[in-house]
Amino acid sequence: MATSLDFKTYVDQACRAAEEFVNIYYETMDKRRRALTRLYLDKATLIWNGNAVSGLDALNNFFDTLPSSEFQVNMLDCQPVHEQATQSQTTVLVVTSGTVKFDGNKQHFFNQNFLLTAQSTPNNTVWKIASDCFRFQDWSSS
C-alpha cells in the first residue's frame, strides 16, 4: 500500500497532467480540429450526446462534421484511477464542464469526461484519450 505522501504526489501529478491536457484539448478542438485525433488512442471511443464513435477514422469523420466551436471550461476535476481497475495502466479520470458555442447555434452548457492513459514513447510519456463522453447540460424549459 502506498503511503499517503506517495498518493498525494500521484494525485498532484495527475492534476498537473489533466490541466495541461485540458488546455491542449480545447485549444485543438477550437483552432486545429484536424489534429484532434492525435490525442486519442487508436481504438478510443467517444460518446457524444449518447451517440458512440469508435476508432480514429470514425472520430476524424465525426469531428469534420462539427461546426467551428468556442469552448470555455469553467470547471476541471481529476483523479487517478486505481491501478487494480486498469490492469496497472496509469490512468486518470478528467471531468470538465463549461460552455460551448458552435457556429450557427446557441451557446450550450456542457459536461465532458475523459479517461486518459499514459503511453510511453522513446523520449517521454504522453497522455492519450481511451474514452471520451460529451453531453450538453442545458436546463429544461418546462
Curated annotation (Swiss-Prot):
Pfam name, any one: NTF2
Residues covered by the NTF2 domain: 17-136
Localisation: Nucleus; Cytoplasm
Residue ranges the record marks as coiled coil: none
Keyword annotations of the record: Cytoplasm, mRNA transport, Nucleus, Protein transport, Transport
GO cellular component, one term: nucleus
Function description: Regulator of protein export for NES-containing proteins. Also plays a role in mRNA nuclear export.
Oligomeric form and interacting partners: Associates with NXF1, NXF2, NXF3 and NXF5.
Protein name: NTF2-related export protein 2
Organism: Homo sapiens (Human)
Upper taxonomic lineage: Eukaryota, Metazoa, Chordata, Craniata, Vertebrata
